[in-house]
Amino acid sequence: MSQKIKCALIGPGNIGTDLLAKLQRSPVLEPVWMVGIDPDSDGLKRAREMGIKTTAEGVDGLLPHMHVDGVQIVFDATSAYVHAENSRKVNERGALMIDLTPAAIGPFCVPPVNLIQHLGSGAMNVNMVTCGGQATIPMVAAVSRVQAVAYGEIVATVSSKSVGPGTRKNIDEFTRTTAGAVEKVGGAKKGKAIIVINPAEPPLMMRDTVHCLTEDEPDQAAITASIHQMLAEVQKYVPGYRLVNGPVFDGKRVSVFLEVEGLGDYLPKYAGNLDIMTAAAARTAEMFAEQMLAGKLTLAPVAPIAA
């Protein structure tokens, strides 16, 4: 298929730069713009060297070019604080917004759990939750699709070197958004999320712990089978997603211990937390793009809200 859907990325930091590398390999997506606010940023320089158009004037520098350059999908890898305004401007021009910040103004999307239902929903903004959410929510969902989960708790441990300034400013949003998605997408009645930023040298690979309390005695065989099935689904787009231990059963508690190794596109392989986020965003965009190219999905501009 030679035809591709054109994309723009807002935020040339760790996540935006890693995502750009993944989009360049995509059979259905073509990145054409990288948007930043600092003309001297490494991310913008790198994008220019790759032949990508750049602007250091923020999203307003992109808007006049969207129609001419045929941009239909925009990724926001900036901060929760500016996302709503970015999304509004992009949606008004008829482009789909894929949100990699914890802003969560659109529906949560965790590809192996609920991506299919978003494709026909007419949503013009989908939120990729957080790196911790992408790594752990599939496992909560794997348990909850077998039997009711009263409580789900996730702990994401990431290397300090892989956590950029945007993520550090959004720690509270990270925990709130992830906990909310553990409930809404994972299916737990109550969710909790904890992030640990580890300064150890050499840097540690991303590790995730998932605890689920089931309402009834856990069906160990069915839950184990469900977890391994879900593991295989995530590995389709994140090959370094591994089950280190578990599921471990202790009364009604089901525990799963995971490790996520990145592909090493931009950041080293220990930054699996960024890799799972960018891989999930690319996978989501590809599914939307395939529908658009097949004529099954047409994007429509979102009318501005009257003041």
Swiss-Prot record:
A GO MF term: NAD binding
Highest taxon of the lineage: Bacteria
GO biological process terms, semicolon-separated: catabolic process
SUPFAM superfamilies membership: Glyceraldehyde-3-phosphate dehydrogenase-like, C-terminal domain, NAD(P)-binding Rossmann-fold domains
Chemical reaction(s) catalysed: acetaldehyde + NAD(+) + CoA = acetyl-CoA + NADH + H(+)
Key word Oxidoreductase present: yes
InterPro entries assigned to the protein according to its UniProt record, in alphabetical order: Acetaldehyde_dehydrogenase, Acetylaldehyde_DH_C, NAD(P)-bd_dom_sf, Semialdehyde_DH_NAD-bd
Keywords for this protein: Aromatic hydrocarbons catabolism, NAD, Oxidoreductase
Residues that coordinate or bind NAD(+): 162-170, 273
NCBIfam families: ac_ald_DH_ac, PRK08300.1
Family: Belongs to the acetaldehyde dehydrogenase family.
HAMAP family in the cross-refs: Ac_ald_DH_ac
Protein name, UniProt field: Acetaldehyde dehydrogenase 2
Originating species: Comamonas testosteroni (Pseudomonas testosteroni)
